[in-house]
Curated annotation (Swiss-Prot):
The lineage of its organism: Bacteria, Pseudomonadati, Pseudomonadota, Betaproteobacteria, Rhodocyclales. It holds the Pfam family ATP-synt_ab. Its EC number is 7.1.2.2. One of its GO terms (molecular function) is ATP binding. It catalyses: ATP + H2O + 4 H(+)(in) = ADP + phosphate + 5 H(+)(out). F-type ATPases have 2 components, CF(1) - the catalytic core - and CF(0) - the membrane proton channel. CF(1) has five subunits: alpha(3), beta(3), gamma(1), delta(1), epsilon(1). CF(0) has three main subunits: a(1), b(2) and c(9-12). The alpha and beta chains form an alternating ring which encloses part of the gamma chain. CF(1) is attached to CF(0) by a central stalk formed by the gamma and epsilon chains, while a peripheral stalk is formed by the delta and b chains. ATP binds at residues 156-163. It is a peripheral membrane protein. Keywords: ATP synthesis, ATP-binding, Cell inner membrane, Cell membrane, CF(1), Hydrogen ion transport, Ion transport, Membrane, Nucleotide-binding, Translocase, Transport. PROSITE patterns: ATPASE_ALPHA_BETA (PS00152). It comes from Dechloromonas aromatica (strain RCB). This is ATP synthase subunit beta. It is an enzyme of class 7 (translocase). CDD domains: ATP-synt_F1_beta_C (cd18110), ATP-synt_F1_beta_N (cd18115), F1-ATPase_beta_CD (cd01133).
C-alpha cells in the first residue's frame, strides 16, 4: 500500500503526490492516514482519483468536507475503487455515498462489498420486456404507460410536483410490488429524505427499501457518486434474479455535481457552462440501469428542468435514455389540476397497439386529439368568446375540459394537505372512463363533477350532489 502527501487543496479538489512507481489508478480510493487526525479534518476522509497529472501527482475529489486539510498530510492508497456494502443487510437502512450508515442504527450487517464503478451489462445479456406496470395514476397509465424493467423520467421545473409524483409512484408501486426497492437521494433537500423515510416506516415497507442519500449540503464529490452507490446496490439485487425498483431524485443534481467537479478539475466548459463530458457521464450511469436475462431494474427518475426549458443540455441528454417521459407543466399546475402532467408532451414507447392493445391505444389518441383541438381553439375563445364557435367545436371544447379535469386525481401522499383521500384507479377503469367521455356518454354532467375524483362512477355520484 503506497503512501503519498497532499500538495495542493482547492475546495473539493485535492492534489496528492505519490512515488512515481506507485501512482494510483484513475478511480482508486485514497484514505487520509489515521495519524493525521487533528480534530479538524474528517477522520479517514476518502478521496477518489480523477486525473493523473504526471510526475507522481494525482488530482482527486474529496468524498467529504475538505475543511482542515493542509499540505503535507499523509494519504494511503487502498488500491481499489470506492466499495460499498451490498446485499440483504442494506435493506431498511440509510447510507451515505461510501455505504456508511447515517441512521444511527449500528453497523450495516453485510460482509460483501462491491466497487461502485462497474461495466454496463453486455449486449447479449440484456432483455426487453413489454409487460406494463400499473401505477394507479390515470394520466400516466393512459398516456405514458410504464414498462416493467423500463426507464421513466419525471420532468418538471421548480415546484410543479416532481417529488410528490415520485412519492405517489413509490406509494402505489413499491407497496403493491412485493420486490425490493432502492432509493437514491441525489442533491435534494434533507427534509424530503426524512419525509420519505417516515413514509416508508409508517407503511411497513421499510424492510424492503435500501436508501442512499447525498443531499444538497454535501460536497460535490458525494453528490456525483451517490447515484452510482445506489445503482451498485440495485445491481446486486438484480443479479440475484430479483425485479428491483430504483428511484432517483434528482438526476439534474447529478449533472450539476459533475459540472462543479469539472470546473474544479480545470476542464473547459461546453454549452451553458456544463461539463464537456456530460453525455458520457449520463451514459455511464444510464447504461447500467437496465434489465438482464437474470433480473430487472425498473427505474423512475425525477429530472429538474432549469427555467422550464426542456432544450437545456441536461434534460435533453437525459431524454435519450428513457422509455417513458412524464412532463409536468406549470400551465396545468396553475389551473389547479394535479398531477400536472402534460398529456400532449408526455410520451411512452409502450403506447403502441401491439403492446397496450387496440382499445387503450385508440382511447389515448382520442383524448390527445380532443385536448389538441381545445388548445388550438383557446386563442379564438379568448378573443371572441365561446358563442362564436360552431356547435361541433363547442362540443369538442366541452369534452376536452371534462377530460382535462378528469385527468386530475387526489394522491395518497397529499392527503395531509388536500384533506381528500387518495385514489388508486385501475387501468381498466381509466380506459372505461375516458372512452365514455370521448364518446359523449357524459355530455350531460357538469364539468366540476370530473375534478379530483377517482373512477367514472365517482363522477356520476358527485354530479348528483352538485
Amino acid at each position: 500500500m503506497s503512501q503519498g502527501s497532499i500538495v495542493q487543496c482547492i475546495g473539493a479538489v485535492v492534489d496528492i503526490h505519490f512515488p512515481r512507481d506507485a501512482m494510483p489508478k484513475v478511480y482508486d480510493a485514497l484514505k487520509l492516514d489515521a495519524s493525521e487526525a487533528n480534530g479538524m479534518a474528517e477522520d479517514g476522509l476518502t478521496f477518489e482519483v480523477q486525473q493523473q497529472l504526471g510526475d507522481g501527482v494525482v488530482r482527486t475529489i474529496a468524498m467529504g468536507s475538505s475543511d482542515g486539510l493542509r499540505r503535507g498530510m499523509k494519504v494511503n492508497n487502498t488500491g481499489a475503487g470506492i466499495s460499498v456494502p451490498v446485499g440483504m443487510g442494506t435493506l431498511g437502512r440509510i447510507m451515505d455515498v461510501l455505504g456508511r450508515p447515517i441512521d444511527e442504527a449500528g453497523p450495516i450487517d453485510s460482509t460483501e462489498l462491491r466497487v461502485i464503478h462497474q461495466p454496463a451489462p453486455k449486449f447479449d445479456e440484456l432483455s426487453s420486456s413489454v409487460d406494463l406496470l400499473e401505477t394507479g395514476i390515470k394520466v400516466i397509465d393512459l398516456i405514458c404507460p410504464f414498462a416493467k424493467g423500463g426507464k421513466v423520467g419525471l420532468f418538471g421545473g421548480a415546484g410543479v410536483g416532481k417529488t410528490v409524483n415520485m412519492m405517489e409512484l413509490i406509494n402505489n408501486i413499491a407497496k403493491q410490488h412485493a420486490g425490493l426497492s432502492v432509493f437514491a437521494g441525489v442533491g435534494e433537500r434533507t427534509r424530503e429524505g426524512n419525509d420519505f423515510y417516515h413514509e416508508m416506516k409508517d407503511s411497513n415497507v421499510l424492510d424492503k427499501v435500501a436508501m442512499v442519500f447525498g443531499q444538497m449540503n454535501e460536497p460535490p464529490g458525494n453528490r456525483l457518486r451517490v447515484a452510482l452507490t445506489g445503482l451498485t446496490m440495485a445491481e446486486r439485487f438484480r443479479d440475484d434474479g430479483r425485479d428491483i425498483l430504483f428511484f432517483v431524485d434528482n438526476i439534474y443534481r447529478y449533472t450539476l455535481a459533475g459540472t462543479e467537479v469539472s470546473a474544479l478539475l480545470g476542464r473547459m466548459p461546453s454549452a451553458v457552462g456544463y461539463q464537456p463530458t456530460l453525455a458520457e457521464e449520463m451514459g455511464r450511469l444510464q447504461e447500467r440501469i437496465t434489465s438482464t436475462k437474470v433480473g430487472s431494474i425498473t427505474s423512475i427518475q425525477a429530472v429538474y428542468v432549469p427555467a422550464d426549458d426542456l432544450t437545456d443540455p441536461s434534460p435533453a441528454t437525459t431524454f435519450l435514455h428513457l422509455d417513458s417521459t412524464v412532463v409536468l407543466s406549470r400551465d396545468i399546475a396553475s389551473l389547479g389540476i394535479y398531477p400536472a402532467v402534460d398529456p400532449l408532451d408526455s410520451t411512452s414507447r409502450q403506447l403502441d397497439p401491439q403492446v397496450v392493445g387496440e382499445e387503450h391505444y385508440s382511447v389515448a389518441r382520442a383524448v390527445q386529439m380532443n385536448l389538441q383541438r381545445y388548445k388550438e381553439l383557446r386563442d379564438i375563445i379568448a378573443i371572441l368568446g365561446m358563442d362564436e364557435l360552431s356547435p361541433e367545436d363547442k362540443l369538442a371544447v366541452s369534452r376536452a375540459r371534462k377530460i382535462q379535469r378528469f385527468l386530475s386525481q387526489p394522491f395518497h401522499v397529499a392527503e395531509v394537505f388536500t384533506g381528500s383521500p387518495g385514489k388508486f384507479v385501475s387501468l381498466k377503469e381509466t380506459i372505461k372512463g375516458f372512452k365514455g367521455i370521448c364518446a359523449g356518454e357524459y355530455d350531460h354532467l357538469p364539468e366540476q363533477a370530473f375534478y379530483m375524483v377517482g373512477g367514472i362512477e365517482e363522477v356520476i355520484e358527485k354530479a348528483k350532489t352538485l
